[in-house]
Structure formats: structure tokens, C-alpha cells
Amino acid sequence: MKKLGREIDILVNYPKAKRDLSARLESKSEESRAIGRKFGFDYFDGSRNHGYGGFNYSQRFWQPVIPTIIENYQVSNSSRVLDVGCAKGFFLYDLKLELPEISISGVDISEYAIENAKPEIRKYLQVANATKLPFADDSFDFVMSINTVHNLNLQDCALSLQEIERVSCRNSFITVDAYRNDEEKARMEAWNLTALTMMAVDEWKDFFLEIGYTGDFYWFIP
């Protein structure tokens, strides 16, 4: 039987924003969710009601995180790294700055995000569905997917995690929307715009075991 990976917060040094959950809950509608789930301009660079309200590069986000990733997963210039749900490629851009010879790849469902990715690394990115990654088995030393898998329904969550497992020959790490109690569940429901699958942390762990995901994981809890 496959073993569960580590519950580890490798994003501990990622800047945490203070969020007005009540305001977001009041302004959110099914229409806003539908627009956000298209993952186009409106989600990345349109109104805050539909997503980020401007998804722009800043070195303060990923550069503090990269040393933790390098330390935990022995990522080096000879590594092959995949970001599933790479958006505009900001993580991979900063990783390439730190390790210029590293082999990077990124996939995202959003044509808009890939078309508007960092120009320096756009050639390494492609539009693809997380449930069918366009790579051979064991293609990568490290696969990461941040706040992406939960945007799929439960069946497709399983497929995407199995795909991460398939293309990774060493390590992987994901984060998903989760909660530990009723208060956190209520906050999650207030905050959620795009996720189709949200579970308690123990339910996620059982799910990982059930579908055979052995990589590391952590939670997004607003």
C-alpha cells in the first residue's frame, strides 16, 4: 500500500495578505463565480469580484519561498521541475533566476495566462489540462501545484493527482482548499470563488491514500 506524503508548509515564507472575507462574501455571486472559473482576463486582471484584481509579478512573492523548496526537495541546476497551474509563470521565472541551468515546464488551463506570461520563460509554458499532462512517465524530479487541483470536481481531482504522481520520478507538492473546523469551513465558503472541491484536512488525506497520491501537501485556509 502506498504511503501518505508529508504535511509540510513549504510556502511558510510566502507573504500573507489580510483579506476582508465579509466584503468578498457580500460582493460575490454565482455570476462572479462563473466568470472567475473561465480563468481569463476577468479572473487575472479584471475586477476583484472575479479574481485577483491584477495578477502582476513581484519578486517579494516567490523569491523568499525558493530556498525552502531547494532545501526540501534537493532542487538544483540539473533538476527538471513542473508547475501544474503555473498561471503567468512567476514561480518558474524566479526559480530560473536562482538556478539558471534548471529545466522548467509549466502548464495551465488558461490560454490568457499563458499568452500573458513572463516573456523570458513563455517558451517553457503551455496550455494543458491537469487531468491529462502532456509529458511522459517520470519526466520530472519535482512537480508542484499550488491552489489548482481543488478547482476540479472530485473525479478530476483524482485524475490530476494521479497525473502528478505519474510524471514525477521523485518529489511533488500541492496545496488545496481545506478546513479543520466549522469556523474555517464557513470562512472557506465565504472566500471561495473557483474551487469545486473543498474538504476537511482529514478527508483530503483519506482521498490522497485512496487514489494513490504519495507526494507532499499542505492547505490553503483563509
Segments (PLM) and residue ranges:
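A conserved beta-strand element that flanks and buttresses the S-adenosyl-L-methionine
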Residues: 144
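Class I (Rossmann-like) S-adenosyl-L-methionine-dependent methyltransferase catalytic domain
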Residues: 1-73, 78-134, 152-159, 163, ...
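Hydrophobic adenine-recognition pocket in adenosine-nucleotide-binding enzymes
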Residues: 148
